[in-house]
Structure formats: structure tokens, C-alpha cells
């Protein structure tokens, strides 16, 4: 049985190792630019994606899109494959709110990476009255929000969401997944999300006593 287990592991890992050798030869010897979708960055967790952030930092794992509300609860979580640009995800995130809760939000605050004139126009067309992008990328405050006051409120709200993400990483282990496989990766993320929401609801209940 032990020999069969080892044989099974070799059958799984040898093709991955050969793919790593191939992509290394293409990149180093032939000078070819290997597309990220073709790269194997871990033979033990072959589902791992290469994630570039702000064209500076490189991470390995999967991009996670979180949506939070005024209740401090996490309202939605998307665990993505590949490294799609944030600007390509804006409409989907809004549509998911409509699918889950039956309506679009009246106000929204997003990272600068989600900003574009097309995304702003699309959001306004869905009835979202105020859309605050952390970095306007050519958009004026008057285009995004009905007033500078609302814009500042939404910016502060987004800062609170960022603080919540830091808490997820620091206290609930969301900075690094220790479970094996992509399905387990998703379970790990959702366990942190559910735990965070349960803690938030418990704090609210305790504050009422």
C-alpha cells in the first residue's frame, strides 16, 4: 500500500515537474515570455495563481473580492482563478449584490483599481447614486458623488473596510492558507469570513446587555 501511494504521488508530480522544466527552458534559454496562466509556481499547490498588485508587489494564491456593509458584516466573497484586473470585476460585484439581496446598494466605495468611466456609468445606470473610488483615475468628485461630504463619508467607510481586512489577516489567519487544494482553499477563506461575521454579531449582542 505504501508503494502504491508513492507511485500515485509520482504519477501526479512528475508531469508537473516536467512542466516546470519546460517553462524554465522557454523563459531562461529561449527568452520567451511565458503567460501567467501557463506557469506552474508550486508543484504541491498547482492551482496557485500569480497575483500582481499595483504593478509592484507579487503574491501567490488567489484573488479574493470582499463586499462589506454598514453593519460591519461581510456581505459577499468571491474567490477567483487567474488574475483579472479589478476594473473587470466592478459590474459583477454590483450584480451579485442584486442577485443575493434583491437590489443594488444606494452607495458604494471601492479601491482605485475598480475605477473607470465605464464602470462609473454602469453603476449609475444600476441606480447606485454615489460611487466613491479611492483613486479617481481622471474622475471628478462631482461625477462620482452628489456632494463632497458624501464622498468623504464613503472614503472613511472604505478605510473601515480596509481595517476589517487587516483584522481578518491578523486574527483569523486570512493572510496565509494552510489547507491543501483549491477546494480547501475556498473552505479556508469562507471559514474566516463566517467566523468574522459570527464575532461581529456576538459583539453587537454583548453591547446590548
Residue ranges and their predicted role:
Residues 42, 68-75, 102-103, 138-147, ...:
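Short acidic (Asp/Glu) and glycine-rich catalytic loops that position anionic groups and cofactors
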Residues 71, 79, 95-102, 113-114, ...:
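Hydrophobic alpha-helix feature that most strongly marks membrane-spanning transmembrane helices
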Residues 96-98, 107-109, 138-142, 162, ...:
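Short C-terminal domain-edge/linker segments immediately following a structured domain
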Residues 24, 149-209:
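Basic, amphipathic alpha-helical segments enriched in Lys/Arg and hydrophobic/aromatic residues
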Residues 42-45, 76, 81, 116, ...:
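Generic structural "secondary-structure junction" signal
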Residues 1-106, 110-112, 120-122:
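Polybasic low-complexity intrinsically disordered regions
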Residues 2-5, 100-109, 113-155:
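An internal, acidic/charged active-site-proximal segment
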